[in-house]
From Swiss-Prot:
Record SUPFAM superfamilies: CRAL/TRIO domain, CRAL/TRIO N-terminal domain
Subunit structure: Interacts with DEGS1; the interaction increases synthesis of chromophore-precursors by DEGS1.
Function as written in the Swiss-Prot or TrEMBL entry: Soluble retinoid carrier essential the proper function of both rod and cone photoreceptors. Participates in the regeneration of active 11-cis-retinol and 11-cis-retinaldehyde, from the inactive 11-trans products of the rhodopsin photocycle and in the de novo synthesis of these retinoids from 11-trans metabolic precursors. The cycling of retinoids between photoreceptor and adjacent pigment epithelium cells is known as the 'visual cycle'.
Protein name per UniProt: Retinaldehyde-binding protein 1
InterPro entries recorded: CRAL-TRIO_dom (IPR001251), CRAL-TRIO_dom_sf (IPR036865), CRAL/TRIO_N_dom (IPR011074), CRAL/TRIO_N_dom_sf (IPR036273)
Cellular component aspect of the GO annotation: centrosome; cytosol; nucleoplasm
GO molecular function ontology, one term from the record: phosphatidylinositol bisphosphate binding
Species, as recorded: Gallus gallus
Pfam entry (one): CRAL_TRIO
Record's keyword terms, sorted: Acetylation, Coiled coil, Cytoplasm, Retinol-binding, Sensory transduction, Transport, Vision
Length: 316
């Protein structure tokens, strides 16, 4: 008889209880969306351990290793030199975002740092004078929106309601600039780093004029933002109420999507039963088929930046 070998670890009752809790979470089990995380919930720490290979010892070792890798690679290629320059003065919490986004694989975290810097070099128009005040009016208009409550998985839910979007009044680039500011701001929160984001795109009222007005290059820029350019875990993208000609726009996007993100795209149309199984109607505004009042972008901007007169004015 051949010997059976392997490594076995006794799972504590506390750990098992946390894993059981993870299977039946509600929106009330998570911390606030806005502001820094005061304390990571125990079940979220367990999730980080199970999904991201995170432990207290690993955090310290991985940050140290990533810092060293940044310096080691600084003299190799231009983007590596740019990474080293961009990372000067960054604290451990900044590096930890990238490590968590790549499940504590330090080399993949470094590649993400390169993507983060390269995206800024590739699309400088998105980052020119990029301050909270520069994008505030776009966010107040709801492009994009952010729910005040996390979903049951602890993810931040971002909204886009295309019906009233005038792409001549608010350009595609202005919306992407708003996304960039929002992502930087929300990723200061450790719960968000671990649990990630969910995006809901409401295409009710999407016109053929809007469809023809969006350039393929703009769609690619959006996909580049979602893939390998931010230390963010994009866990799901839901499209609802899309008309038949939405397929044309989506077919332009699909070739740019990597298989991992493509698997996380859900196109619901008018059949929303599975959508509401994932996203509780009690956290959704009325204009997204939920039980809350209509979405208020001005309230969101205040949550992000404070009142207008006190808003930050620091370039990212």
């Amino acid at each position: 008889m051949s010997a059976v070998t392997g490594t076995f670890r006794i799972v504590s009752e506390e750990e098992q209880a946390l894993r059981t809790k993870l299977e039946r979470l509600t929106t009330k089990d998570h911390g606030p969306v806005f502001g820094r995380c005061q304390q990571i919930p125990p079940h979220t720490l367990q999730k980080a351990k199970d999904e991201l290979n995170e432990t207290e010892e690993q955090r310290e070792a991985a940050v140290k290793a990533l810092r060293e890798l940044v310096q080691e690679r600084a003299g190799s290629e231009d983007v590596c030199k740019a990474v080293a320059e961009k990372m000067q003065g960054k604290d451990d919490s900044f590096f930890l975002r990238f490590i968590r986004a790549r499940k504590f694989d330090v080399h993949r975290a470094y590649d993400l740092l390169k993507g983060y810097v390269n995206f800024r070099q590739q699309y400088p128009e998105l980052f020119d004078n990029l301050t909270p005040e520069a994008v505030r009016s776009t966010i107040e208009a709801g492009y994009p929106g952010i729910l005040a409550s996390r979903d049951k998985y602890g993810r931040v839910v971002m909204l886009f309601n295309i019906e009233n979007w005038d792409y001549e009044e608010i350009t595609f680039d202005e919306i992407l600039r708003a996304y960039c500011v929002i992502l930087e701001k929300l990723l200061e929160n450790e719960e968000t780093q671990i649990n990630g984001f969910c995006i809901i795109e409401n295409f009710k009222g999407f016109t053929m004029q809007q469809a023809s007005g969006i350039k393929p290059s703009e769609l690619k820029k959006m996909v580049d933002m979602l893939q390998d350019s931010f230390p963010a875990r994009f866990k799901a993208v839901h499209f609802i109420h899309q008309p038949w000609y939405f397929t044309t726009t989506y077919n332009v996007v699909k070739p740019f999507l990597k298989s991992k993100l493509l698997e996380r795209v859900f196109v619901h149309g008018e059949e929303l039963e599975s959508f509401y199984q994932e996203i509780d109607a009690d956290i959704l505004p009325a204009d997204f088929g939920g039980n809350l009042p209509k979405y208020d972008g001005k309230a969101t901007a205040e949550q992000l930046f404070g009142p207008r007169i006190e808003a930050e004015d620091t370039a990212l």
